Amino acid sequence: MKTLFASVSENVQFVLLCLAVTAAVVLLAWGGEKLVMKKRHRLNAAHTITTVGMLAAISGVLMVIELPLFFAPPFYKLDFSELPVLICAFSLGPVAGVVCEFLKVLIHLLLKGTSTAFVGDLANFLVGCSFVLPASILYQKLLSKKGAVASLALGTGVMTVFGSLFNAWFLIPRFAAMYGLPLDAIIAMGTQVNGAITDLPTLVLLAVVPFNLLKGVLVSVLTFFLYKRVERLFFRRAKQS
């Protein structure tokens, strides 16, 4: 906890930027929710807050469990923390999904702190939202099994495109600068696992794109098969009241 507070005090401007970006994403989610959930019956506030908190806690713990990938540098690791967030967004709407995403990152910070001066944490939040937001907005409009498939496919596609561009434009160069490394040193980590990676575009194409695509597909499949079961567990009594 002390380490986290020290990191906040050392990076006040960037933390404020993170909060501003979070507020902007919440507003975007609120607009999408108003558009597709105008006359939908809503759960009471206490149950919503409790459910979002529980799913965020599960996500925060899942975020700690990371799996290395054979085709990507060691700083790209797979986790399934988006699964509870997607279930939250499908059940309660885009705003709840974004709040759950934010709390997930916050819980992870409390558990492990930050080793990236919050840059990686902001990236995780934004890339996660690029998956959850479009998927949940479309699902809330369609509300069917076919709609769920289309929504998850859309979310995976948006996350893959956004995550890849965000890595190329901001994240990889920022990490290189933060650790005082030339960009070539980051690329060399990719070359070690795949000789075809020789520059930033091939690093993104051969490591970042497959990473986001694999994560999106796996989380989507799990969400499709688990969503209704988890929804019944968390939401049945509240919806009957």
Label each region the model flagged.
Residues M1-S241:
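Loop-helix junctions at membrane interfaces
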